[in-house]
Design a protein with these regions (language model features):
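Long, low-complexity, compositionally biased intrinsically disordered regions
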Residues: 1-498
Length: 498
C-alpha cells in the first residue's frame, strides 16, 4: 500500500485514502464524529459541518475543528455551499459503460482569514469552489488546514431554508464541548475514487494558472448572459466580448472564452440573484483554436463562486496532461520538498517571499508550486492570480497514475533517447520506430501518431517527455551549467506570472 502523502502520514490509519498497488483507484473512508446538520434556535439557525480527516497547522487530525461564527451574508454563502455539494454529486456526461456514480464529499480549507469549499464532479469535467472571504465571516478561523466535510441529504435539504430565516451560525467541525453536548457517534461511508478523478483535481489547478481574464460583466448583464446561454448546445460555443456583455459564437477568435457543454454551468443559476458580477477566464486562443477549458466566477460580494469546466463535455480534466512535464522534472520535485516546508496555509502564496527564503530563482519556485498542485497541496485562485495552500488526502499516488510519464521513464532507462547535436530536439526509439522530437514554442512537436492527433492540446507525449528529461540532464552535467536558474530548461516550466 502506498502512503497518502508525506503531509498525511497518519491518514492511512485513521480513515484517509487507501491505494491499490497499481493505483487505478483509491478507496476513501469518510468517518464523521458529528454528521452535518442544521439546527434552529431562537432568532437564528446553526449549520454544523462534520469533518473527516485532514491536515492542520499542527499535523494530521481525525476530526479537525476550524471555525465557528456568523455569516455576514447567509444567502449567498448557503447557496454557494449547496452549489459545491451539487457539483460533487453530479455527472454532466455519462458514458454508456458507466453505471456507478462517484460521490466524493467536498473539501474545505481554512486559510487563516477565509474558508474555501471545493468539489469535483463525478465525470471529472467540472470543478467548483466557494471562497468565503474575510468580510463574509464574523471572527477568524481558529485553525488552518483542510478536511472533508459531510453534506448529507438532510443537511442539504435544510440549508436553503436556514439561510433565509435570519442570522446563520456556521461551524466547521466541533470543539470538545460541542461534541459532548451533541453526544454523537462516528458514522462511516466509503467511496471508491478512480485514478482519473484523482488526477483531474490536480490538472484543474495547473490549467487555471495559465488562464487570463477574458471578460467582466456587472449586475443585470451578468445575469442576462448566464440565463440566456443555451443548455442543449451540441458543439462548443465561444463567448466573445461585445459591448458591456458577451456574445456567443460557434468558432474561436482572439479574446474569446470556450464554453463546451453549457449545461455544466447550471449550478450558477441559484446564485444569480446574489451576483454582483461575472468574471470569465480562459487561456489565450486564436482564430483556429481547438476547445480549451474556461472558468466562470460569480462575484457575490464577500464571497466568490467559481466553476471551471473542461474543454469538452465528454472530456475530463484528467486527460489534459498539463502536469506531466512538471511530474517528470526531478529538480521540480526536489524544489517542491523545500518549498512545502515554507508553506504556512497562506491564503495567497507570495512566490517572491518563497524565492527569497528558499534561495531559489523565480522560475524554479513557479515550477515547484506547479508540482505541488499536481499532488493536491496547493490550489490556484484566479481572482488573486496566486496559489493558495491546501492539502488534499490523496496526493501521493498522482504521479504514478500518468501512463505517459511512466512510459517516458522506461524510454530513458532503456537508453532510447539520442539528443540532436545542436540541442534542437532528439530522436526517440520506441516500439521499433524512431520518432523525431523538436523543441519549439508553444509546444514541442513529435512525429508519433499520438502527438499528431492532439497536437499538444493534451500535454506532451511520452517521447517529448523523455527527450526533455534527457536534455535537462545533459545540461545539468555540462561544466558551468546554469540550468538551476533557467525556467526554460525543464518541461512544463512556465515563467512566473506577474
Amino acid at each position: 500500500m502506498l502512503p497518502v502523502t508525506d503531509s498525511f502520514p497518519a491518514l492511512a490509519a485513521v480513515g484517509g485514502a487507501q491505494y491499490s498497488a497499481v493505483v487505478a483507484v483509491a478507496e476513501l473512508a469518510y468517518r464523521y464524529r458529528t454528521p452535518s446538520a442544521v439546527r434552529y434556535e431562537v432568532g437564528r439557525s446553526e449549520v454544523l459541518l462534520g469533518t473527516s480527516g485532514g491536515g492542520t497547522e499542527v499535523g494530521p487530525e481525525l476530526h479537525p475543528y476550524f471555525f465557528t461564527g456568523f455569516l455576514a451574508e447567509p444567502g449567498p454563502a448557503a447557496a454557494g455551499m449547496l452549489g459545491c455539494a451539487a457539483v460533487a454529486r453530479a455527472r454532466y456526461y455519462t458514458p454508456a459503460s458507466v453505471i456507478a456514480a462517484i460521490v466524493a464529499d467536498p473539501v474545505v480549507t481554512s486559510n487563516g482569514d477565509r474558508l474555501r469549499f471545493e468539489s469535483f464532479s463525478g465525470c471529472c469535467g467540472v470543478h467548483a469552489r466557494l471562497d468565503l472571504l474575510p468580510d463574509a465571516l464574523t471572527g477568524q478561523p481558529v485553525r488552518s488546514g483542510s478536511t472533508n466535510v459531510d453534506f448529507n441529504e438532510g443537511m442539504r435539504a435544510a440549508l436553503g431554508g436556514a439561510a433565509v430565516s435570519g442570522p446563520l451560525l456556521l461551524s466547521v467541525g466541533a470543539d470538545e464541548v460541542a461534541v459532548r453536548t451533541l453526544g454523537a457517534s462516528v458514522t462511516e461511508r466509503k467511496v471508491t475514487l478512480p485514478g482519473r478523478w484523482l488526477k483531474g483535481f490536480g490538472e484543474v489547478q495547473a490549467l487555471a494558472r495559465d488562464m487570463r481574464l477574458v471578460a467582466e460583466l456587472v449586475g443585470a448583464e451578468a445575469q442576462r448572459f448566464i440565463r440566456g446561454v443555451p443548455r442543449n448546445a451540441r458543439r462548443p460555443l465561444w463567448a466573445v466580448p461585445a459591448g458591456r456583455g458577451l456574445a456567443l459564437a460557434v468558432s474561436s477568435q482572439p479574446g474569446a472564452a470556450c464554453l463546451a457543454g453549457p449545461h455544466r454551468l447550471a449550478e450558477l443559476g441559484p446564485l444569480l440573484r446574489f451576483a454582483r458580477g461575472l468574471r470569465v477566464y480562459g487561456p489565450p486562443v486564436g482564430a483556429l483554436s481547438l476547445p480549451v477549458p474556461s472558468a466562470w466566477e460569480l462575484d457575490l460580494g464577500a464571497a466568490r463562486f467559481t466553476l471551471t469546466v473542461s474543454p469538452e463535455k465528454y472530456r475530463g480534466f484528467s486527460g489534459e496532461g498539463a502536469l506531466l512535464g512538471l511530474l517528470a522534472d526531478a529538480e521540480a520535485a526536489a524544489d517542491a520538498d523545500l518549498i512545502s516546508v515554507l508553506l504556512a496555509w497562506d491564503p495567497r502564496i507570495d512566490a517572491g517571499r518563497l524565492s527569497a527564503e528558499a534561495g531559489l530563482p523565480a522560475g524554479r519556485v513557479t515550477a515547484a508550486l506547479g508540482y505541488l498542485a499536481a499532488s493536491g497541496r496547493v490550489g490556484y485562485d484566479l481572482a488573486e492570480e496566486a496559489f493558495f495552500h491546501r492539502e488534499l488526502p490523496f496526493g501521493a499516488a498522482l504521479e504514478t497514475m500518468h501512463p505517459r510519464l511512466v512510459g517516458a521513464r522506461e524510454l530513458m532507462s532503456a537508453g532510447s533517447v539520442t539528443l540532436a547535436a545542436d540541442g534542437a530536439g532528439a530522436v526517440v526509439r520506441s516500439g521499433g520506430v524512431e520518432h523525431r522530437v523538436t523543441f519549439t514554442q508553444p509546444h514541442d512537436t513529435c512525429t508519433c501518431p499520438w502527438w499528431g492527433k492532439y497536437r499538444g492540446t493534451r500535454g506532451p507525449c511520452k517521447h517529448v517527455l523523455a527527450a526533455r528529461v534527457a536534455a535537462g540532464r545533459a545540461n545539468d552535467a555540462r561544466p558551468g551549467s546554469v540550468a538551476a536558474g533557467s525556467a526554460g530548461d525543464v518541461p512544463g516550466r512556465a515563467a512566473a506570472r506577474p
